């Protein structure tokens, strides 16, 4: 029985390490991108197939969904440059983005509250269209009379100005009585027949969602018919925000995702875009492209005809791959008819930013699940809520991990205490077990009978030593995904040399401390009588120290605190058991 208990503990540890490594490659791996030809400047090229197919429209879209003729360095040049005059610059407290007036696509987004890397002051680039990468948010009106389906190409919108900031915003009072600064960027396109299309982007200070609205004023003599579309288009370039450290490469999930009322969260890998195409209709759905810590998503909104109140519309959600291997997640609205002399408004929300669960949950059902904690999400969710609670009090994620670990140990204390008490008794009877092995070692049946009698007499359960580890492993794994998936912990410092809890310890100090605590903890456990088992258990602290060298510092911190509390708990229990045994022996003496 004792041998089986030790193998169970050893097996649980190896299974945990194996699951972590397997998860890196299985759920979060992705196919390596095919090499792409790069040029100094991305010029417009024919991607007509990138437009979604309109319903009931006897037209062929000869237009393009163009790439901005601009590089990242040129975007950072002066506003008076020839390139920047083609684009509309919008700067809020959260975004610095550029809109191409041809088609009204967002061709670059910089997230001002998130740095490119820990040691960089450059903002994280969410969307871009340059020699390195194509990743844009597109929208427009397609169909029979949609300007984006015109044979002459996508519409060139007129703009009032080419640079907007929050200084151009207006104060708006919401229904809850709060005042917000709201910035609206209008783009106008007029047809010779008298149809006016106003495409507007609305930004609210402090909020990531962008409202993209198309208003059609039909002053012509004929009925106008079209559909709104919104899509995210991305090439197969690598994730700029992925983690890659040491001998292990953390391949975070990069791919499509979508949700509907009856299927809240679904992944769709880029490699499966051709074989598992998304094509479904939903009211209240969404489409997204997910990467490490960040997500971009289209959420279809409301349709308003003439003076009627806006109502949510049923949108077609779809995925496809273009002729030039661009991955597209998008939606199209139903066909909209605007009789002569009337108007309509149709909108959608675009989210392009960090995966903040509270904000995503308010936007659409299931969108917050892009923060993917895997199959242990119920435990991970509780751990994250606990971390948030402590962080709101002390303002440091490292100390929050320590306090959360203490709380978890207190909750598990009664169960673990019972297990450690049994292990302490095993430690006390170890000499007697060794004597029995020497006496009955050749007779396995007699040895097993004597051992069972000893366990029963001393009220010892050798398998109970597995309980603490079995309780800790799900928490350990869940906390790993919390550290890897929660953008709140990205670049979060603790103290001293630990300036990023989601990355490995740069000096390997915490893993070495963890190895010491594991060694001390082993010394408090009953030692194996089998020489081979003893050798394996002696090298386990070394093995786990090597594993932990490349794990997030926050996870190693959790394990150190957990081991330290366990050592104290086990030491006191061992002393108590030894004292009780001495008290039993003394009267009989």
Question: Which residues are covered by each model-predicted region?
Answer:
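Membrane-protein biogenesis/insertion across secretory and organellar systems
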Residues: 1-410, 580, 584-589
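Core hydrophobic alpha-helical membrane-spanning segments
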Residues: 8-21, 476-479, 512-517, 539-543
